[in-house]
């Protein structure tokens, strides 16, 4: 049961299945009880509950690890996620809460992610610490089905000289579906062909032919600390239209600027349009850097949507789950 009273705590899932804590405005997290040393996620906002993921204990020095943990759906009935914020401890790249159809047999599993984990996964909440800035507009939500199994996918890049332990939490607000909200989902276009020579500039680019009409309420780019510029443009009706054009800063890796659109006037992408994603970099290290240590991604959220869409190096696919 999810308690919505601002004065109650409702621990529903324990141990390997994670924990949900609720809820209320200005609730102060208890580091000693719930969080690892040095990790102090922001307090809960109005009507939010907190999902605390199980620890990731196997992040080796220099490791680039994606970890998948399956938990039971803690909510009674079908609910709409109407706001979400995701947070990670040190070395976190992103944390995403997803719904996975047909994953009942995996309940309680926690391990390195495989391609099978990404099949049939749908975005629900999170992203990165940038989720603190993420806004879900009125009339749109990410829907959790009544009987679903949830998966927490976390990505860690340990740049230290020793092994690390990681933790992720989600502060989310949910409401019962009321017939007026449309379900939304994630769209991402990216390239895995990213190579930065030592101490030099570099570029990466990809294009994606849109396969279906989409209405987006948010659009943005994603690169890491060596990015210097990210552009998204669209070819349609014989013209090229600039959609997103940002100089890049290292902190944008966790806090990328997003462009928002009103749901009554969303950004329209049409079948046959060609989306271009162009990224520029300056490698300040002595080592060659490749994907996924550096990335070039265009991403957004579309509605109505029942499955996430990924377009990797021009290959369109659905239901693969989350960001690259």
Protein language model regions, located:
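Bacterial N-terminal signal peptides that target proteins for export
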Residues: 1-13
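Intrinsically disordered, low-complexity segments enriched in Ser/Pro/Gly/Ala and basic residues
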Residues: 4-5, 29, 147
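C-terminal motif of bacterial Sec signal peptides marking the signal peptidase cleavage site
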Residues: 19-22
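Bacterial signal peptide processing site
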Residues: 24-26
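Beta-strand-centric surfaces of beta-sandwich/beta-rich domains
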Residues: 32-215, 220-324
């Amino acid at each position: 049961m999810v308690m919505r009273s601002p004065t109650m705590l409702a621990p529903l899932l324990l141990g390997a299945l994670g924990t949900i804590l609720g809820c209320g405005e200005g609730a102060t997290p208890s580091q000693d009880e719930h969080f690892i040393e040095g990790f102090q996620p922001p307090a809960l906002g109005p009507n939010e509950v907190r999902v605390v993921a199980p620890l990731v204990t196997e992040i080796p020095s220099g490791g680039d690890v994606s970890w998948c943990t399956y938990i039971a759906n803690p909510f009674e009935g079908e609910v709409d996620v109407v706001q979400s914020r995701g947070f990670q401890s040190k070395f976190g790249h992103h944390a995403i809460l997803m719904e996975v159809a047909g994953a009942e047999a995996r309940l309680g599993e926690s391990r390195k992610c495989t391609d099978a984990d990404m099949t049939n996964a749908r975005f629900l909440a999170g992203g990165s610490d940038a989720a603190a800035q993420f806004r879900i507009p009125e009339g749109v939500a990410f829907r959790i089905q009544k009987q679903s199994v949830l998966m927490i996918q976390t990505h860690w890049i340990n740049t230290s000289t020793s092994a690390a332990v990681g933790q992720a939490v989600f502060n989310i607000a949910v409401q019962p579906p009321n017939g007026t909200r449309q379900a939304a989902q994630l769209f991402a276009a990216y390239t895995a062909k990213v190579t930065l020579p030592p101490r030099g500039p570099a570029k990466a680019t990809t294009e994606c032919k849109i396969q279906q009409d989409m209405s987006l309420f948010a659009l943005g780019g994603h690169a890491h600390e060596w990015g210097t510029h990210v552009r998204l443009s669209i070819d349609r009706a014989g013209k090229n239209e600039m959609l997103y054009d940002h100089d890049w800063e290292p902190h944008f890796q966790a806090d990328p600027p997003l462009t928002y659109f009103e749901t009554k006037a969303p950004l329209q992408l049409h079948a046959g349009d060609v989306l271009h994603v162009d990224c520029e970099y300056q490698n300040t290290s002595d080592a060659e850097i490749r994907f996924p240590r550096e990335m070039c991604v265009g991403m957004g959220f579309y509605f109505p949507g029942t499955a996430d869409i990924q377009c990797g190096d021009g290959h369109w696919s659905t239901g693969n789950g989350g960001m690259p």
